[in-house]
Amino acid sequence: MAINAQEISALIKQQIENFKPNFDVTETGVVTYIGDGIARAHGLENVMSGELLNFENGSYGMAQNLESTDVGIIILGDFTDIREGDTIRRTGKIMEVPVGESLIGRVVDPLGRPVDGLGEIHTDKTRPVEAPAPGVMQRKSVSEPLQTGLKAIDALVPIGRGQRELIIGDRQTGKTTIAIDTILNQKDQDMICIYVAIGQKESTVRTQVETLRQYGALDYTIVVTASASQPSPLLFLAPYAGVAMAEEFMYQGKHVLIVYDDLSKQAVAYRELSLLLRRPPGREAFPGDVFYLHSRLLERSAKVSDELGGGSITALPFIETQAGDISAYIATNVISITDGQIFLGDGLFNAGIRPAIDAGSSVSRVGGSAQIKAMKKVAGTLRIDLASYRELEAFTKFGSDLDAATQAKLNRGRRTVEVLKQPVHKPLPVEKQVTILYALTHGFLDTVPVDDIVRFEEEFHAFFDAQHPEILETIRDTKDLPEEAVLDAAITEFLNQSSFQ
């Protein structure tokens, strides 16, 4: 048989042309140090800041420190199986988390993995945890109210959709309760809620999740949890993961409420990571960029322009103070970033005034423009009245004789404090808030004994529900008060029927 050299050479040539090498070229390095959620690696010459890196055992890390000799890496998850000398590879990607509708009703960790035992989350959408905030021209001013269902907040420090309102106070003053009640009040309000629990006990998070489930709020809520037992990198990442999930909905034109509970623990986790990465410590041993840590997070909350869908992210960050010191480093940082703060006082809480909102130290810088007309009318002088009452109350401790006008102010003040109290997990619709505050500010409660105010309010709301639902409907639909004569007549009718005269 004759050998055809041309045929063979053509065949070989074809084989060479069709050959596809079955390998990929990736830059690798070697782990030189491991411990406390931190690794150092040598050899990753072209790695990017924030890039995702893959360890030999399948764990992932994120490049944080880019130095001339090595790279400082925070490890996402368990680091006990990683050893010095292990290989580490670049992925060329930055960290992303799963996003979308399928996360609603689920409890996930900061990497988007389910921790509620309800199976896998099926979504093919992801978003980067670090993303630029909307620019100046991409934003709209805050104009729509976000009703918390709490009289003290909706009347004194109103919050608008797209606002950042800090909730600040000592531990055990009711910060989480305010957030949970606000989430409960978003039912049927076309609002998606994200609750980010940072550095809390797992039993506490479980309790919050059960509360949300019990009241049907888990149907529109995502819970992101990085518990106290988890490594610092996950506590540091949790808020960014939460806001990435929120951005997906915002850019679809939806409205989102996100709660960060709390950013003090995130700052402590970041301080721990920074010290382990040998970054220079500053005030209170925090690194120099701790302000940027929170500003780049909170600036991502906004009400975006109509061209981008007109959606919004409203942020309620928490800061825990020590002995009521709101001039501490992290507290003043976050106060300067946010659009106002709600200060919860230890003394008020212990005196049974709950929610323990200190009206004098609390402010909402942009929420007033989002408050509905009816609430503006009834609550306009409430803050000043409350402040003057506190002043007079302190003055009366000296036992001075009081004139009739001062005594009347004190009586009104005591009733105001009682009306603004509210039981937990019982948010009140805004139309009911308006009616009781109208009755208060127009003197209808001046003859009601202070001890009977709570019972008075319960019966008052029941009466309006049964006898005058049209008044509540008018306030709900028009966002304004009905004719004063109509309201006065209805309240007088209630007083004539009741035993409070």
Swiss-Prot record:
GO terms for cellular component: plasma membrane; proton-transporting ATP synthase complex. HAMAP family: ATP_synth_alpha_bact. Keywords: ATP synthesis, ATP-binding, Cell membrane, CF(1), Hydrogen ion transport, Ion transport, Membrane, Nucleotide-binding, Translocase, Transport. It catalyses: ATP + H2O + 4 H(+)(in) = ADP + phosphate + 5 H(+)(out). It is an enzyme of class 7 (translocase). Its EC number is 7.1.2.2. This is ATP synthase subunit alpha. It is a peripheral membrane protein. GO terms for molecular function: ADP binding; ATP binding; proton-transporting ATP synthase activity, rotational mechanism. It comes from the Bacteria. Induction: Induced by a decrease in external pH from 7.5 to 5.7. F-type ATPases have 2 components, CF(1) - the catalytic core - and CF(0) - the membrane proton channel. CF(1) has five subunits: alpha(3), beta(3), gamma(1), delta(1), epsilon(1). CF(0) has three main subunits: a(1), b(2) and c(9-12). The alpha and beta chains form an alternating ring which encloses part of the gamma chain. CF(1) is attached to CF(0) by a central stalk formed by the gamma and epsilon chains, while a peripheral stalk is formed by the delta and b chains. The keyword Glycoprotein does not apply. Produces ATP from ADP in the presence of a proton gradient across the membrane. The alpha chain is a regulatory subunit. The record marks 362 as: Required for activity. The gene is atpA. Belongs to the ATPase alpha/beta chains family. It comes from Streptococcus pneumoniae (strain ATCC BAA-255 / R6). ATP binds at residues 169-176. It is found in: Cell membrane. GO terms for biological process: proton motive force-driven ATP synthesis.
